[in-house]
Amino acid sequence: MKKIIGLFFIIILIVINISILAYDYPKAEQEQKWDEVDSIAGEGGLIFRPGRVKNESTKAVGCTVNKYLWQAALEIISFIPLASVDSNGGVIITEWYSPRSNTNFRFKINIFIKDDVISPDAIEVKIFEEILKNKQWVLNENTSNLAIMLEDKILRKARDIYINSVR
């Protein structure tokens, strides 16, 4: 049995070695040509809405996540306990929260900040709603437009924070 495990281990090491060496192997002429060709979309990528170009003035320096969006998102959901926060990745996840006015309803919010510029494309909010039925939490399929309203509120707050910071 030990010989079989040892042989298996050696085979895995050989496969890893071969894959590392194959990565470094010179490419064919056609592959080299494709590597040298630039993107047809250019450096900025494709612009699907030419009239809506990102305003680079709100760009956060040295970050991949816009600090104004980040601060606004945290301030707006400050009443809900946080489950996970990743400032480098731009992810905010809350715990389940039930308003005092309706204890048979709860929701959880996931916020993703995906860009370093304040824009509607830079933020994504997902809200999961559950309703208490027969003493069990059931996912509410008829979700409200709360996510869109929250995105809008975060964008407005981020804009206000930005305007106050440049004064």
Swiss-Prot record:
Q: Where in the cell is it found?
A: Membrane
Pfam families xrefs: DUF3576
Coarse class of the primary localization is membrane
Q: Which residues cross the membrane?
A: 4-24
User: Cellular component GO terms, alphabetically?
Assistant: membrane
Task: List keywords of the entry alphabetically.
Answer: Membrane, Transmembrane, Transmembrane helix
Q: List the membrane topology term(s).
A: Single-pass membrane protein
What name does the UniProt record give this protein?
A: Uncharacterized protein RP420
Species whose genome carries this gene: Rickettsia prowazekii (strain Madrid E)
